[in-house]
Structure formats: C-alpha cells, structure tokens
Amino acid sequence: MSKNIFTELSDAMASAAEQAGNSTVLVDARRRFPASGIAFAKDMILTADHVVERDEDIKVILGDGTELTARLAGRDPGTDLAVLKLDSASAVPAVVAKTPARVGQFVLAIGRPSKRGIESSFGTVNAIGGPVRTGRGGMLESFIKTDVVSYPGFSGGPLINGEGQVFGINTSGFGSGGAITIPADAAWKVAETLAKHGKIKRGYLGIRSQTVNIPEDGQSQLKRKQENGLLIVGLEAESPAGNGGLMVGDILVGVAGEAIEHHDELFTRLSGDVVGKSTPLDVLRGGRLEVVNVVVGER
C-alpha cells in the first residue's frame, strides 16, 4: 500500500530537520539559557546577538555532539546577529536555499537548545516584508514572518524548507505578532562582514529630509519607475552631504544607482562598503537629474 500524502509530507519534513540539524549547533554564551546557531563555515557560527553575553570561553556543541570552544568574532546589535570563531574547523556548513521563501510555504524552525538534540516547530510563511527597523538601532532590507512557535533556545537557529535548506536565521530580538526570520542572503552578508571586520559600518549624510512626490518632469528623467524621493530641508554643519555639494531643495532619488523613496531605504543603503567612500547620489535639482559624489560619513 502506497503512503498517503500526509505520511510523505511528514517523512520529508523529518528528513529535512535531520539534514539541517547537522549544521545547527548549541551556543552556550549567556547565563542560564543556551541558544542555537548555524554553521556558515567549518570554523564559523552565526547566531543571534542577544544570546551572546561574553566574548571568550563560549561553549558550542555541534550536531555530532562534539563540544568546542569559541570566541566572539564580531557582532551587530542593530541586526541582532553575531559570529563566533570555533577553535577547530569541525562544523558542517549549512546549505542555503537557492530560491527565497514564498508566502504560503511550509517551513520548519530548528533549534538545539539542549544536549538532547534538535527540536523543531512546523508552520507556514505568513508574509515577506521590509525594510524594517529592528528596534535595536538597525535596519533590514527584508524579513520573513511565520507562524512557527519559537521555543526557548531557538533564537539563532535556522528556518528551513522541505529539503533542509536554510531560508534564514530566527531571532526574537525584534518583531511581534509572529516569529521573525532574517533572510539567509542578508544574514550571510552580515556574517561575512563580521567575520572579516568584527562590526558593520553604518553611514550618514547629515541631512534632514522628508518624503515627497517626484514632479512629472523629474520622473521623466529617471530610467526607472519611481514616484517618491527625499526632499532635503536641512543640512548639518560640516556634514558629508554639505561638503559633497548637496543643497537644501534637492530631491534625493538614488544612492549608487539604487532608488531611494523613503528614509528606511536610505538608512539601509548607507551601510557596509559605501561608508567612507565617494558614492554617487542621484538628485533632482531645479527639475534636472544630477549626480553628486559624496563621501559617506561613519556613525
């Protein structure tokens, strides 16, 4: 007798949990309550920043039960992410999903909150959104919202698809009304930067601005469909924007070729590699599109 669809689904999700469990670790870096983490390299663990309370002598237990010592390699409270460096390159790196999560997909949240092994929670993707302020001073370009139950110790563990591939990293550091996951592509970028530099650079221009509709004559000059921009209403003294040539009355519509329509998008774009570098800003000035190169300051 052939298996019914529910048995097949159940078996598939159990296999997915087992596969992801190989890369899901226990992270003991705070008093009383261990948490979870994801191996993104053989010697690197990605976890949630809020579960890391010390820099040294961090205990990590791998999927095969091996207990290792780790140290904090970098952290970014703004995105609630931290990277740990293992004293041995023994971890099994996680496999990231090739396609992003979609609303309605079945997912599993995986955690390793104790030495007993992995735990899982089943649910569906409720929404894909962003940008979103994390409540910890940072900004994410996107997030995944699910109805999985995030049990104690699940923070830092993966959200996976039916093949055991990682959609993102679970965090309880921000969000309400459902479990929040940081998408894998965004999390891995942060992780790679933290592993290299120990922190995430965040930039600023030193402007005061408000969202406005772009006039029709301005829209006709853009090579993309864009309705809004940021009207500059003030400049800080000796600000990067002022020193670079931006003026009150300019409408900022792009940073390094990427459209800017709202303050949250500007916050997101002014981070990482652009900080400290001359960056082209697209502005509408007197109805004409101009490019102004500004050296982005560091907060």
What is each model feature region?
Residues 1-17, 113, 166-227, 263, ...:
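C-terminal cap/linker of serine protease catalytic domains
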